[in-house]
Amino acid sequence: MISRRVFLKTAGAVLVGSRASLRGGAAVNAVRYVDVAGSAGISFQHDNAASPEKYLIETMGSGCGWIDYDQNGLLDLYLVNGASRRPNTSKHALRSALYRNNGDGTFTDVTIKAGVEAEGLVGMGAAVGDYDNDGFPDLFVLGYGRCILFHNNGNGTFTDVTDRAGVGNIRKWGSSAAWFDYDNDGLLDLVIANYVDWSPEENFWCGDKGPGLRSYCHPDVYRGQPPTLYHNNGDGTFSDVSKRSGVGIRPGNGLGVVTFDYDNDGWQDIFITNDQMPNFLFHNNRDGTFREIGYSAGVAVGIDGQFEAGMGTDAADTTGSGRSDLIVTHLDQQLARLYQNVGEGYFEDATFRSKISYATFHLSGFGTRFMDYDNDGARDLFMANGHVLDNIQRYHAETTYAEPKLMFRNVGHGIFENVSDQLGPDFLLPRVSRGAAIGDFDNDGDLDIIISNNGQAPQLLRNDGGNANHWFQLLLIGTRSNRDAVGARVKVTAGDLVLYDEKKGGMSYQSAQDPRLHFGLGQHTTVEEVEIKWPSGELTKLTNIKSDQILAIEEGKGLVDRPFPRVPLRSA
């Protein structure tokens, strides 16, 4: 995991056709991100159980997630914890934490009352989805050796149904997961990116024995684990279809996952990032099986053909083509890769042309999202960074353990500009970041960020100023389709601005995202048309919608009344 790669400034970086700028807002917005975690009452501290033995599980987690568990229109927060001692002991067991959004800028720890401690789990990630279509989101917590499924009882409490449901992922190292409906039967299935076959008994000595510098072992030291795919049987149980579906045939060093329809055929595909081996892109064959096509699609490796430390990922349309592009974050001395979807089932490595290469070369990226942070109508790119070695400066004096975050502003024509130093001191504060989830926790129309930090307190970065431009958010509610509407495609037209999005599963690194779709509108105050194609094939069209509001749309019915209370601004 600490191996270096030669920086290849490839002269043949792939170029793509220029497009008109997507931006519909002011050229620059005075957006600042302010860390309000402390003033909001979030006292959580991640424990990584750091030890001289350098157990690999110490450095890989953990994640976080937004979940409106009580369905009051306010995003609540789940933070995954690690382990406090050796992974094979139960002493001093830690717990993860659920914080309820009070609607006044503060949160209350309701973990014990809700019953979602996940105590004793060496926690990694979280995934949120309503697997039984009862209207209340359920919580899946990933970990080393096992995972936990908490069923939402609808009364503020959860029940551990892992054994009954059959989704324990036993003896595997689950990193990230995605709820999605791969067979379009109206029920959410579950795919898990599993990491490596590591154990405390095989925690080999890696590093430089001369000066006694120990490091975490490279993933190549261990055998990779294949992904897991669980099919939802519709009766509260799941069947492991990993092998017969084709998803679990090949081992991988899986860390991140996103499900999206890369070829716009109406069926969700699976992309999994792998650490120091080719990434997986599983094409949905529409018959319950998948075919791995990473190399032929152009996303297995970057343009230089080297294996890289694939960690976080996301998919979104960044050019207005109506096709979803991909981002993959990597270790420092590598590059975060931006793969542009050029159609016909193929992606091109646009990392150099997009101008994200230089800034990402020096940092280790984990959580990442495409997001319109300034609401100008173009999706920008966020990355949470942090090295994997706490003693990295003893190897490389110029590299630090804690690292700053990155924000790249989409300036159109497939080009991004690094604006990280314009977003305030809290945004630049170095941390050992892992998971990241984007969500509008105060319902003011601009996107906030929760970041989980390894061995540190989380950061809740409130977006101040992003709503100077106009915006529009949608909560999609499936009826014939799965209730979360994962797989739905949306087209929004506001004047000359045409935006595309789809309801995806997974994203980022070990983290669960805001379930609502967010659209920045720039200076447009009216959305002329919203077109939704549901996974069932049904079409919904709405016209002449005012901007600056959150709407709930139910399949087959249209607009439905749901509360989305605005949270008053509170000083940090």
Model-derived features: positions:
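Blade-edge motifs of beta-propeller repeat domains
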Residues: 2, 25-58, 99-121, 151-172, ...
